[in-house]
């Protein structure tokens, strides 16, 4: 069953999402943002500005999912201009960040996170692991830039929907 905004709002008041925006925010200080907050059947999470790491190829190495080492992940610089704070994800690259919001999933619900079309249109694909019943914390957000151009990944703006 997909939960609606009323249920999400009630659960947020009990600590399910923090910080919580009770409405879908599309503008901040009269400037457009990639929306975040509560929508009809979901909640748009934001990427934290605290840490974003980009996968870099190290010649002679092979990435092994059974023996992963973070040596291939390097911190990305946080940029800022009139459009907001952002990281640059190089073409055909992969990045990891963390959600600004902390979630506390109820013990009888599993949360599914999906990417948003705003980013998919520019080739930025979000791959997020479901948060299982009872899980607590800040979700790791995974982004793949499938385009041939570098992409901005905005911090504190919408990234995925829970």
For the regions a protein language model found, what residue spans apply to each?
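DUTPase catalytic domain/fold
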Residues: 1-162
């Amino acid at each position: 069953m997909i939960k609606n905004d009323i249920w999400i709002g009630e659960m947020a008041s009990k600590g399910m999402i923090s910080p919580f925006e009770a409405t879908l925010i599309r503008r901040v200080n009269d400037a457009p943002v990639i929306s975040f907050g509560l929508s009809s059947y979901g909640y748009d999470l934001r990427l934290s500005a605290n840490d974003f790491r980009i996968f870099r190829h190290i010649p002679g190495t092979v990435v092994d999912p059974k023996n992963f080492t973070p040596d291939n992940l390097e911190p990305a610089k946080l940029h800022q201009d009139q459009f907001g704070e952002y990281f640059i994800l190089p073409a055909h690259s992969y990045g990891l960040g963390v959600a600004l919001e902390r979630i506390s999933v109820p013990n009888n619900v599993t949360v599914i996170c999906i990417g948003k079309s705003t980013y998919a249109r520019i080739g930025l694909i979000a791959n997020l692991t479901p948060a299982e019943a009872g899980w607590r914390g800040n979700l790791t957000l995974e982004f793949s830039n499938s385009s041939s151009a570098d992409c901005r990944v905005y911090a504190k703006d919408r990234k995925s929907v829970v």
